[in-house]
């Protein structure tokens, strides 16, 4: 077996461990948090967490895709890697300053956020962690072993802290701070590894590189914003319209779905930089790799969707417990998402983005975001968390369909 295949498989395994720590380790505390906080306070927790995820999305700006691709193409040149690294870091510093100003204004001026200001600010460590955690550097250089180490250590650290310090329904802010601190700890460990390995040179500030970095990531940022509109945004709108209990039911079911779906991420994250670099050298080999990825992801995603559909009642009963009756219905409605998202990841990220169709990719996700806005208000008003689940499913169906049509119409998978 050649070195490239061994390297790819090794990276998939490392990323599987990373995703296991990201999704499965928090599941050790998930049932405890759900039961300790109760449906209403767990809903408040989810509402504030979703708000902070929007802030993180702004700071992330799509660099996990664009910077990964840039690093993958320049992995053998320390000077180029250094230039890309500092351009992204300084870009993120600009974005985090804007974010903190906006967050301060929001918690002062919006009554719903003012009421939960302490809880919202308890999630800020995750924002800082996103700034200093260069996942894109590790992925671009295909050095997943170190990414695995930093992720596992940080996730393990928060487990005992949750059981020790979160004891009553009122400990929402403590729970938020502990959960969000995992990203910060992971970022500190990752930066120490980067320095120790000598992957980057001295600090270089180039305004031209910062502007170019922001420009390169703009269309992906618009795309991720649109995705957040119909994923994270649904939780926020549901909270405003239907209240924290509905958010608690939706968030509980969606957490189970994300835990299973997240197991697909090792394959998608490991193969993306490999596809990017392979297409540059040999398009035919790149297309063959994409088709293999499509087969693998669709089969696994389909199996996960069946597990969620057929096992919804058991999964909710075991992981959540009593008081979350509507979570079973929500989980059944959103059960097709792992299959749909596995397809849209291939057609959108692995095909459209690697072929430089960033604008078209953005337009599809913007259309999906607009559809979610049209559906979310009437459906959540009428059906609360069930309406939110229907909105999410309908939006993902549109995304997958449009991406599939674009790829086929432009014959992007024809060698």
Curated annotation (Swiss-Prot):
Protein topology in the membrane: Multi-pass membrane protein
Annotated Pfam families: Polysacc_synt
Location of the protein in the cell: Cell inner membrane
Segments on the Cytoplasmic side according to the record's topology features: 1-11, 63-83, 139-173, 242-295, 350-362, 407-415
One of the GO biological process terms: O antigen biosynthetic process
InterPro entries in the record: Poly_Biosynth_Transport, Polysacc_synth
Residue spans, topological domain Periplasmic: 33-41, 105-117, 195-220, 317-328, 384-385
GO cellular component terms, semicolon-separated: plasma membrane
Keywords on record: Cell inner membrane, Cell membrane, Lipopolysaccharide biosynthesis, Membrane, Transmembrane, Transmembrane helix, Transport
Annotated transmembrane regions: 12-32, 42-62, 84-104, 118-138, 174-194, 221-241, 296-316, 329-349, 363-383, 386-406
Domain of life: Bacteria
Metabolic or biological pathway, per its Swiss-Prot or TrEMBL entry: Bacterial outer membrane biogenesis; LPS O-antigen biosynthesis
Record has Isomerase as a keyword: no
Function: May be involved in the translocation process of the nascent O-polysaccharide molecules and/or its ligation to lipid A core units.
Similarity-based family: Belongs to the polysaccharide synthase family.
PANTHER family: O-ANTIGEN TRANSPORTER-RELATED (PTHR30250:SF11), PST FAMILY PREDICTED COLANIC ACID TRANSPORTER (PTHR30250)
Name of this protein: Putative O-antigen transporter
Taxonomic path: Bacteria, Pseudomonadati, Pseudomonadota, Gammaproteobacteria, Enterobacterales
């Amino acid at each position: 077996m050649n070195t490239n295949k061994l390297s790819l498989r090794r990276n998939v395994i490392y990323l599987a461990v990373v995703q296991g720590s990201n999704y499965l380790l928090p599941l050790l505390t998930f049932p405890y948090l759900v039961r300790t906080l109760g449906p209403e306070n767990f809903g408040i927790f989810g509402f504030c967490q979703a708000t902070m995820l929007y802030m993180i999305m702004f700071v992330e700006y799509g660099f996990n895709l664009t910077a990964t691709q840039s690093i993958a193409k320049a992995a053998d040149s320390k000077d180029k890697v250094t230039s890309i690294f500092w351009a992204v870091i300084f870009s993120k510093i600009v974005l985090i300053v804007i974010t903190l100003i906006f967050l301060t204004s929001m918690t002062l001026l919006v009554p719903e956020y003012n009421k939960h200001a302490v809880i919202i600010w308890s999630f800020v460590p995750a924002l800082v962690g996103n700034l200093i955690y260069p996942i894109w550097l590790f992925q671009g250089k295909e050095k997943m072993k170190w990414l695995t180490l930093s992720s596992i250590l940080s996730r393990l650290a928060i487990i005992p802290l949750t059981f020790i310090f979160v004891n009553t329904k009122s400990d929402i802010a403590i729970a938020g701070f502990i959960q969000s601190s995992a990203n910060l700890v992971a970022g500190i460990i990752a930066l120490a590894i980067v320095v120790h390995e000598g992957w980057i040179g001295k600090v270089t500030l180039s305004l031209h590189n910062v502007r170019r970095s922001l420009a390169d990531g703009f269309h992906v940022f618009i795309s991720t914003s649109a995705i957040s509109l119909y994923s994270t945004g649904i939780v926020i709108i549901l909270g405003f319209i239907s209240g924290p209990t509905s958010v608690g039911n939706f968030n509980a079911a969606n957490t189970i779905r994300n835990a299973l779906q997240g197991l697909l991420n090792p394959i998608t994250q490991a193969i993306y930089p490999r596809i990017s670099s392979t297409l540059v050298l040999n398009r035919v080999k790149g297309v063959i790799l994409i088709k293999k990825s499509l087969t693998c992801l669709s089969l696994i995603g389909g199996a996960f969707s069946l597990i969620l559909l057929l096992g919804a009642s058991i999964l909710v009963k075991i992981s959540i417990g009593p008081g979350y009756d509507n979570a079973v219905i929500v989980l059944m409605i959103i059960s097709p998402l792992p299959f749909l998202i596995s397809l849209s990841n291939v057609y959108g990220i692995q095909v459209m983005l690697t072929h430089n169709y960033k604008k078209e990719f953005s337009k599809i996700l913007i259309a999906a975001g607009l559809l979610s806005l049209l559906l979310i208000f009437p459906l959540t008003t009428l059906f609360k968390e069930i309406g939110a689940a229907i909105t999410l499913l309908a939006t993902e169906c549109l995304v997958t369909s449009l991406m599939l049509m674009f790829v086929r119409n432009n014959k992007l998978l024809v060698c």
